[in-house]
């Protein structure tokens, strides 16, 4: 290895590979990180390349996948972009924005990615590993793979799986999802497609999402171990009722089952939705039911509507127009409706979207300037470079409190002075360009912010939900809701405890 002077051989890296996408790699890494932290180690998460529009911004303004940020929280450390040196952010038509060490470095098609970005990507992965070991000489890397490590048509350009495992001589776990069926074929097939030197890296197998009596798989466990000569380190029970699905706490496939919710929230499911982890704090409120809206419908059943962030704001605005959702959102606003936009959602609530540099999907439309929904008097102009930074501010509305979060967006948004509602529109934060709101004549409020993570601010969230309650003539709550960060810690601890009960990590460490 090229970094031996910074590497403590006692803390051999652990890598979690999967027999497929969605096998449980992300949650397994999250659990291992917390288990090792409790054992007194210094775990640090790492994923060489991730593809996601669910992102986080570190203290230096660097973008990284939210799943690696969550894993860093599990380690009890601050997220940093070298934990996820390559982030690919899909933006439609088989193209992605390429992020290296937190910074946007270009756009690539799937076809050209290997030719243009493979070698630069491998260099940035090695550089990031060196940075981590230089800063943390006693750490143990807990590495997440991506998809299957043996996609034979792609293996020569796979930056995330066996190339990293061999480079680090990592102790690898192979995770498989028994819920999907065919678990024996998944395990044997994956191992058979590996080269002998790759297969030697696999130190254990983990069966994930087992329903029912674990003792019923005793013979299956023995068969796998006899056939592969690799120990089955654990059989993890079905945890989906307790924990979020694969890919970083996303809510897109989750369903709420509250029989009598006090607050009903509708979130617009945009084609290019980004940062859906923004809604985890709402999902964790016992009184709130979330539903995703993907087609035009009467919205009056909802206490408030959220328009989320977007990777392609103009393209998603066109979707709202063509689907009829834009009209339904306007109708809802005239009927005591409450609407909240985040980032791209804020921009779409405005009057005008201008895209002179084709940054936000206007190449799908001959006109580079289109109308927004028009519920806030705001004009957004998209520029060549985007803004990524952490936010430390203070709110003015609906209460005064400290606010933390982060921005990831292209475009500058200003009040549209030609609009009659300008005087009725107020700032939400002391930093004026972070958000605006206005109260409807018909009742209800229209508001939006550039701050991702806004609902993680417990006091602000409590006051905003109470404001919604007032507009819907519901009782306001005097008690404070549980801290979202404490709730997240509880979720991670429970996850680690479940894994600890069913996973022989000491066998792996020894």
Swiss-Prot record:
Tell me the function of this protein. Answer: Catalyzes amidations at positions B, D, E, and G on adenosylcobyrinic A,C-diamide. NH(2) groups are provided by glutamine, and one molecule of ATP is hydrogenolyzed for each amidation.
Question: What are the positions of the active site?
Answer: 343 (nucleophile), 452
Stated family? Belongs to the CobB/CobQ family. CobQ subfamily.
Name the pathway it acts in.
Cofactor biosynthesis; adenosylcobalamin biosynthesis
According to the entry, every stretch annotated as the GATase cobBQ-type domain falls at 262-460
Q: Which SUPFAM superfamilies match?
A: Class I glutamine amidotransferase-like, P-loop containing nucleoside triphosphate hydrolases
Q: Does the keyword Plastid apply?
A: no
- What does the UniProt keyword field contain? Cobalamin biosynthesis, Glutamine amidotransferase
Does the keyword field hold Lyase?
A: no
Q: Where is the signal peptide?
A: none
Write down the species.
Prochlorococcus marinus (strain MIT 9515)
List, in alphabetical order, the GO biological process terms annotated in this UniProt record.
cobalamin biosynthetic process
Name of the molecule in the record = Cobyric acid synthase
- Residue ranges spanning the membrane: these are none
Which superkingdom heads the taxonomic lineage of this protein's source?
Answer: Bacteria
Q: Which gene encodes it?
A: cobQ
Query: Single GO molecular-function term?
Result: catalytic activity
């Amino acid at each position: 290895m090229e970094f031996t002077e910074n590497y403590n051989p006692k803390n051999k890296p652990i890598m979690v590979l999967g027999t497929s996408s969605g096998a449980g790699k992300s949650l397994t890494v999250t659990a291992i990180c917390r288990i090792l932290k409790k054992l007194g180690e210094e775990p640090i998460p790492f994923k060489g390349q991730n593809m996601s529009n669910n992102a986080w911004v570190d203290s230096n303004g660097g973008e990284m996948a939210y799943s690696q940020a969550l894993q860093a929280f599990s380690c009890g450390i601050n997220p940093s972009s070298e934990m996820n040196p390559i982030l690919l952010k899909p933006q439609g038509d088989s193209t992605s924005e390429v992020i290296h060490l937190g910074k946007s470095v270009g756009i690539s098609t799937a076809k050209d990615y290997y030719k243009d970005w493979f070698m630069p990507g491998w260099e940035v992965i090695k550089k990031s590993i060196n940075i981590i070991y230089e800063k943390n000489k006693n750490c143990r890397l807990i590495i997440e793979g991506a998809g299957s490590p043996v996609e034979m048509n792609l293996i020569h350009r796979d930056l995330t799986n066996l190339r990293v495992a061999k480079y680090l001589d990592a102790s690898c776990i192979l995770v498989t999802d028994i819920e999907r069926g065919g678990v024996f074929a998944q395990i044997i097939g994956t191992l058979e497609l590996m080269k002998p030197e790759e297969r030697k890296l696999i130190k254990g197998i983990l069966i994930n999402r087992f329903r029912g009596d674990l003792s019923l798989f005793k013979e299956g466990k023995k068969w796998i171990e006899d056939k592969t000569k690799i120990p089955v380190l654990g059989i993890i029970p079905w945890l989906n009722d307790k924990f979020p699905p694969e890919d970083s706490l996303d809510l897109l496939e989750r369903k709420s089952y509250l029989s009598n919710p006090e607050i009903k929230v509708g979130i617009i499911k945009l084609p290019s939705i980004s940062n859906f982890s923004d809604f985890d704090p709402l999902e964790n409120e016992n009184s709130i039911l979330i539903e995703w809206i993907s087609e035009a419908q009467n919205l009056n059943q909802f206490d408030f509507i959220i328009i989320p962030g977007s990777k392609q704001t103009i393209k998603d605005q066109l979707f709202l127009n063509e689907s009829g959702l834009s009209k339904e959102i306007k109708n809802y606003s005239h009927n005591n409706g409450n609407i909240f936009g985040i980032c791209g959602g804020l921009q779409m609530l405005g009057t005008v979207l201008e895209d002179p540099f084709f940054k936000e999907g206007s190449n799908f439309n001959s006109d580079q300037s289109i109308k927004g929904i028009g519920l806030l008097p705001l004009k957004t102009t998209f520029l060549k470079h985007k803004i990524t930074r952490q936010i430390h501010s203070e709110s003015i509305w609906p209460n005064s409190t400290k606010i933390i979060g982060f921005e990831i967006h292209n475009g500058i948004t200003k009040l549209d002075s030609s609009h009659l509602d300008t005087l009725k529109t107020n700032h939400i934060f002391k930093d004026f360009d972070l958000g605006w709101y206005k109260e409807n004549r018909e009742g209800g409020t229209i508001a939006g912010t550039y701050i991702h993570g806004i609902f993680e601010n417990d006091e602000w969230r409590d006051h905003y939900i109470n404001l919604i309650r007032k507009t819907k003539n519901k009782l306001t709550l005097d008690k404070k809701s549980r801290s979202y960060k404490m709730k997240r810690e509880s979720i991670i601890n429970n996850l680690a405890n479940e894994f600890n009960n069913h996973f022989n990590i000491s066998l792996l460490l020894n």
